[in-house]
């Protein structure tokens, strides 16, 4: 139909806007780092971290990406020191992918446990993190849970509920728009820190772990971002979608 064709044309244009940047060789530093991690199946083993990854990092195209990659590796190395791989996998077999239970067992934070879980291929977990502005600072997708590459994410994500209420766990079963046969369980958590002390600014970081879920029962209907979400009855929509509404 003409409506379907127009929607497809709009979607292609929307995606091409990002592809054009990549073709010019100026992909965002965050995307460079995520592409590097994707090539490693998102896994940095304790052996990798101990052996050093500088040779791989040096091959990234931009200095900004190399800086982000080094910061990511430093953080992963600190996580591994507190949550060593062998002991963490043994604990995981007992608790399941519960970041709060794992954090309690190792004296770590839930954010550290989430990052470790996301780096274990067998868990099949996605992970997103954001800063206090809500901007996504890390994006590891999960099957059937597409993440926005540009712009803001869905305001209904529990990630943002957690951002507004640090140190409180949020768990939900969700269904992504366009994924009627797939559901996920998400766990979100936020923390604050004061790197400049009492009189400095409070910084917030939130994370949302995305886990496969095969259970039945009610779900929260969410999307990726408004522009590419076809849910026509969403109360949180901030801008029109370029796709035809579901059921139309």
Please give the residue ranges for each predicted region:
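Conserved binding/catalytic microenvironments
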Residues: 1-248
């Amino acid at each position: 139909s003409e409506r379907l064709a127009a929607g497809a044309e709009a979607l292609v244009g929307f995606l091409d806007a990002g592809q054009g940047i990549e073709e010019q060789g100026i992909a965002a530093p965050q995307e460079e780092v995520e592409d590097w991690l994707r090539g490693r199946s998102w896994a940095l083993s304790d052996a990798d971290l101990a052996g050093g990854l500088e040779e791989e990092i040096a091959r990234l195209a931009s200095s900004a990406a190399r800086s982000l990659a080094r910061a990511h590796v430093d953080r992963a190395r600190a996580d591994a020191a507190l949550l060593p791989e062998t002991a963490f996998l043994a604990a995981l077999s007992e608790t399941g992918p519960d970041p709060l239970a794992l954090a309690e067992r190792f004296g770590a934070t839930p954010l550290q446990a989430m990052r470790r879980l996301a780096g274990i291929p067998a868990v099949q977990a996605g992970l997103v993190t954001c800063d206090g502005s809500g901007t996504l600072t890390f994006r590891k997708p999960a099957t059937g849970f597409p993440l926005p590459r540009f712009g803001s994410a869905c305001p209904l994500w529990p990630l943002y509920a957690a951002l507004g209420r640090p140190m409180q766990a949020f768990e939900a079963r969700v269904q992504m728009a366009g994924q009627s046969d797939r559901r996920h369980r998400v766990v979100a958590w936020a923390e604050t820190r004061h790197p400049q002390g009492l009189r400095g600014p409070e910084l917030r970081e939130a994370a949302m772990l995305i886990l496969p879920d095969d259970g039945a029962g009610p779900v929260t209907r969410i999307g990726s971002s408004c522009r590419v979400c076809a849910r026509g009855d969403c109360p949180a929509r901030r801008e029109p979608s370029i796709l035809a509404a579901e059921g139309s």
